[in-house]
Regions:
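A short secondary-structure junction signal
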Residues: 68, 106, 115-118
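Conserved His + Asp/Glu catalytic blocks
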Residues: 75-82, 87, 91, 103-107, ...
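Metal-dependent nucleotidyltransferase catalytic core
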Residues: 9-23, 57-98
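Active-site nucleotide-donor binding segment shared across nucleotidyl transfer reactions
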Residues: 25-64
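Helical scaffold of the NTase/Pol beta-like nucleotidyltransferase catalytic core
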Residues: 1-39, 197-206
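Active-site ExK catalytic segment of metal-dependent nucleases
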Residues: 70, 101-110
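Residues in well-ordered beta-strands of folded domains
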Residues: 37-39, 56, 94-96, 103-105
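Catalytic cores of NTP-dependent nucleotidyl/adenyl transfer enzymes across multiple folds
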Residues: 112-206
């Protein structure tokens, strides 16, 4: 499938594919009451063949949500987990729909305040400032087995824990984003092998 955006400012083909899939299979209608949003790599056009369709929901009535989510047991690979190690606790539902892996992540937090959404906004800002070649490089790093957030901290020479560092980017000024992109280009041009990521531990190494 082409990664070029459809004419007339339409949706990216893979994002439209994901939306159509969720509606066609009845998943979207099932979770619509919880403000679902497709997040992750697909809306940014940096997904790979192994990428999930990530859906975020705002859920303040977890028992009701779980009862509805259990209707998805008809899909292969179904699992549902209540996670207590997140703040706040979350519900994660996974399954395969027409060959595509889907993950629904639900928390009692507005979607726009959830970590995964803020990561997506951070990545969007960096990609827009860096230009289309950046998305190509992120996909290349992901095909090497590097997860999305560590791939961004490698490409943009960001120090610290990738998952925490990216949470700061949505609050940066435009100048901060631009300066970060320029600095990363300088670092990579002066020493292209100085910045690596340990794909097994997700630790950024300088």
């Amino acid at each position: 499938m082409s990664r070029q955006q459809e004419g007339g400012g339409g949706l990216l083909p893979r994002l439209k594919l994901a939306q159509d899939l969720l509606r066609r299979t009845g998943v979207w209608q099932l979770i619509r009451a919880w403000n679902p949003v497709i997040a992750g790599t697909i809306p940014l056009d940096i997904d790979t063949d192994a990428s999930d369709v990530d859906v975020l929901c705002e859920v303040h009535d977890p028992d009701t949500f779980v009862r509805r989510a259990m209707e998805l047991v008809r899909f292969p690979g179904f699992s549902l987990l209540r996670k207590q190690d997140t703040d706040p606790p979350a519900i994660v539902c996974r399954f395969i729909a027409e060959g595509l892996p889907v993950e629904i992540f639900a928390q009692p937090t507005p979607v726009t305040e959830q970590r995964a959404y803020r990561h997506m906004i951070a990545e969007k800002r960096l990609l827009e400032a860096a230009g289309p070649d950046a998305a190509t490089e992120i996909r290349r790093l992901k095909t090497l087995g590097i997860k999305t957030e560590p791939a961004f901290t490698e490409l943009f020479a960001l120090a610290g824990d990738p998952y925490l560092t990216l949470l700061e980017v949505p609050d940066w000024s435009d100048n901060q984003v631009t300066d970060t992109v320029r600095r990363a280009r300088r670092v990579r041009s002066e020493c292209p092998f100085c910045l690596t990521v340990d794909a097994d531990s997700d630790v950024t190494v300088y």
